[in-house]
């Protein structure tokens, strides 16, 4: 939509977004891209046609949560909404609808933010002045829709699985002409006998003109994940709101639409106030018979079934020819904001009682904003040798006050909320101006819990254990907070060989008392640090060498015994006239006849033995 010289707002409808700094690159009207491989397609579709968005089921495992600092309200576990809560304690539920609005730059309400709990990396929050905010959704209240697209919880509805999952799609930009009709057709993949509820909502763009008009743009989160989405200028979003046009409910009984009796409930008075006819609604279809400028904007279709399936589609309706008449402006790429943190560490450390060693988190960072506040915190929970494995629910670090994190099953074998863990050490860098090397030029204040008896090194990223007792065995979790928000999480299991426990990281929230425990097998095998114990390393080398020597000795003895058996058989059991030996003919008994020197010499010369009538001579024929 041309240059971005002021903040913009975007409707996020993509799946599987990795957290990080929000950037809008090449913000010009571009062709619609397929989310999975970003193949380009036609920008516009013909007027008076029926449009069917492309949907794709392969997406990443992540979920978005909208939340704000409005008044606290009771949380309904059966509702597809999440009620805003302050102190960053909004949490994710298995809801099946999704809608939100991006606002980069000047905020509508600095308390309302968009964040992603299911990734270990940065949350989407850029501070009070440059935060990512949301506006009220659907019926104008402060409830914010969410979606859970964890592939382990849903199957593929298009393949007929019993546990379908929400489906991705590509955005559709529809060009219409004044006084002409247009039809929007959403993708419908239904299962026989399931009751479906469809909702059409509408964000008008009547007050949005020029560069403030909604447009499909290329959006990047961090430097690795980019996608197409609808972007609306912040000034436009302040002057308009989203309306829920209608809701339709029916039970799918067959392939023919005529067999599906449905009920349409018009929940918006927008078009009545404008003295215009509301759009006609059918299952998966929205029709406008005569297009006026009041019908232009963003249409969002959501469908959820009684079996837990959920899907959606987004349409951007604009005047035909707008992109040709709009003055082209050069693309502007905003400077990156926030920070990026990456860590490398071992997930386990085996020690012997009395050892002295260091537990290091190798932290690599790239900070784009200054001044900033940085908190490095070490947390600890003891391990139970009967737990195989220990489970770390990283989502609870982003939502420490969520009920699922504070009250869950099998608490002795899990790490959830930081409120339930012990704080070992922390280092704080406040109002730091040096983004390149904060450890050298910024004042860091460290605090150690004396009960652990550990030493903090390397600016707060390394714990030193001295004369380590068995009681310090446990799961140590390292958390990086940037400007008050969780940016990175890492963990290490410290234990002896006798009480070693594996640990894995889980996505999502832990099961509560009313939910069955997870049945999936661990996907990750925790590596053991090969250099953690000299005694263990020496024993491994010695055992391996002894095994090799023993194997060689066994092979040698087997080969030798086999050769001896074969040789003895050939000498003792060789048949007559073999190639190597043959039996001599019998001669007269020398004791019964007169002996002569000549006969004795002959017998001694040929190596024979005499003493009977069956005198036998063995002669080597090869000589």
Swiss-Prot record:
Region Interaction with host receptor IDE: start and end of each range?
24-71
In the record, which positions carry Phosphoserine? 593, 595
Membrane topology field: Single-pass type I membrane protein; Single-pass membrane protein
Cystine residue pairs: 387-413, 396-405, 432-442
Q: Per the record, which residues fall in region Interaction with gI? A: 208-236
- Entry PTM: Phosphorylated on serines within the acidic cluster. Phosphorylation determines whether endocytosed viral gE traffics to the trans-Golgi network or recycles to the cell membrane.
Q: Which UniProt keywords apply?
A: Disulfide bond, Glycoprotein, Host cell junction, Host cell membrane, Host endosome, Host Golgi apparatus, Host membrane, Host-virus interaction, Membrane, Phosphoprotein, Signal, Sulfation, Transmembrane, Transmembrane helix, Viral attachment to host cell, Viral attachment to host entry receptor, Viral envelope protein, Viral immunoevasion, Virion, Virus entry into host cell
Q: Name one Pfam family in it.
A: Herpes_gE_N
Mark the residues carrying the PTM Sulfotyrosine. Answer: 438, 441
Q: Which domain of life is it from?
A: Viruses
Localization recorded for this chain is: Virion membrane; Host cell membrane; Host cell junction; Host Golgi apparatus membrane
UniProt region (Acidic), positions on chain: 588-601
Membrane side Virion surface: residue ranges: 31-538
Using the UniProt annotation, give all residue ranges assigned to the region (Fc-binding). 352-499
Name a single GO cellular component: membrane
- Positions of short motif Internalization motif: 582-585
A single GO BP: entry receptor-mediated virion attachment to host cell
Q: Which residues have a glycan attached per UniProt?
A: 266, 437
| Family designation | Belongs to the alphaherpesvirinae glycoprotein E family.
Quaternary structure note: Interacts (via N-terminus) with host receptor IDE (via N-terminus). Interacts with gI; this interaction enhances the Fc receptor function of gE. The heterodimer gE/gI interacts with the Fc part of host IgG.
Function text: Envelope glycoprotein that binds to the potential host cell entry receptor IDE.
Protein known as: Envelope glycoprotein E
- Species per Swiss-Prot/TrEMBL record: Varicella-zoster virus (strain Dumas) (HHV-3)
């Amino acid at each position: 939509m041309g240059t971005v010289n002021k903040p913009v707002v975007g409707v996020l409808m993509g799946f599987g977004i990795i957290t990080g700094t929000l950037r809008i690159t090449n913000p010009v009207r571009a062709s619609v891209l397929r989310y999975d491989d970003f193949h380009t397609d036609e920008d516009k579709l013909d007027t008076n046609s029926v449009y069917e968005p492309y949907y794709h089921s392969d997406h990443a495992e992540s979920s978005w949560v909208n939340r704000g600092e409005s008044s606290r309200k009771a949380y309904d576990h059966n509702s597809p909404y999440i009620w805003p809560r302050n102190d960053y304690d909004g949490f994710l539920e298995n809801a099946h609808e999704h809608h939100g609005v991006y606002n980069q730059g000047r905020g509508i309400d600095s308390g309302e933010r968009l964040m992603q709990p299911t990734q270990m990396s940065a949350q989407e929050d850029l501070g009070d002045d440059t935060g990512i905010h949301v506006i009220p959704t659907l019926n104008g209240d402060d409830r914010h829709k969410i979606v859970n697209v964890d592939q382990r919880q849903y199957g593929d509805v298009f393949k007929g699985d019993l546990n379908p999952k929400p489906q991705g799609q590509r955005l559709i930009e529809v060009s219409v002409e004044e006084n002409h009709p247009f039809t929007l057709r959403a993708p419908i993949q239904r299962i026989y006998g399931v009751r479906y509820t469809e909702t059409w909502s509408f964000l008008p763009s009547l007050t949005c003109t020029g560069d403030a008009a909604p447009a499909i743009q290329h959006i990047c989160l961090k430097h690795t994940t980019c996608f197409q989405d609808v972007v609306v200028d912040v000034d436009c979003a302040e002057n308009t709101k989203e309306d829920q046009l209608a809701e339709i409910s029916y039970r799918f009984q067959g392939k023919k639409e005529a067999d599906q009796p449905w009920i349409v409930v018009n929940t918006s008075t927008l078009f009545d106030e404008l003295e215009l006819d509301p759009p006609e609604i059918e299952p998966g279809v929205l029709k406008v018979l005569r297009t006026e400028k009041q019908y232009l904007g963003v249409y969002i279709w959501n469908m959820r079934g009684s079996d837990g399936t959920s899907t959606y589609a987004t349409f951007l309706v604009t005047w035909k020819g707008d992109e040709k008449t709009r003055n082209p402006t050069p693309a502007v790429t905003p400077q990156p904001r926030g920070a990026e943190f990456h860590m490398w560490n071992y997930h386990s450390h085996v020690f012997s009682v009395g050892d002295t060693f260091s537990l290091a988190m190798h932290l690599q960072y790239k900070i784009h904003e200054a001044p900033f506040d940085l908190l490095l915190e070490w947390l600890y929970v003891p391990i139970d040798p009967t737990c195989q494995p220990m489970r770390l629910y990283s989502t609870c670090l982003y939502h420490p006050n969520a009920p699922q994190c504070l009250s869950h099953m099998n608490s002795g074998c899990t790490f959830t909320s930081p409120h339930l863990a012990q704080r070992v050490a922390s280092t704080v860098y406040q109002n730091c101006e040096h983004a390149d090397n904060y450890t050298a030029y910024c004042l860091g204040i460290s605090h150690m819990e004396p009960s652990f008896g550990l030493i903090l090194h390397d600016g707060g990223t390394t714990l030193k254990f001295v004369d380590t007792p068995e009681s310090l065995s446990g799961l140590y979790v390292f958390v990086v907070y940037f400007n008050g928000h969780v940016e990175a999480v890492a963990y290490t299991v410290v234990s002896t060989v006798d009480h070693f426990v594996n640990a894995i990281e889980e996505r999502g929230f832990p099961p509560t008392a009313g939910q069955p425990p997870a049945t999936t097998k661990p996907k990750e095998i925790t590596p053991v640090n090969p250099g953690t114990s000299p005694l263990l390393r020496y024993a491994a080398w010695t055992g391996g060498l002894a095994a090799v020597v023993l194997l060689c000795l066994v092979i040698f003895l087997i080969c030798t015994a086999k050769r001896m058996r074969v040789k003895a058989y050939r000498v003792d059991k060789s048949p007559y006239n073999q190639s190597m030996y043959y039996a001599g003919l019998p001669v007269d008994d020398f004791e019964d006849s007169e002996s002569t020197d000549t006969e004795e010499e002959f017998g001694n010369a040929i190596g024979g033995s005499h003493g009977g009538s069956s005198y036998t001579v063995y002669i080597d024929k090869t000589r």
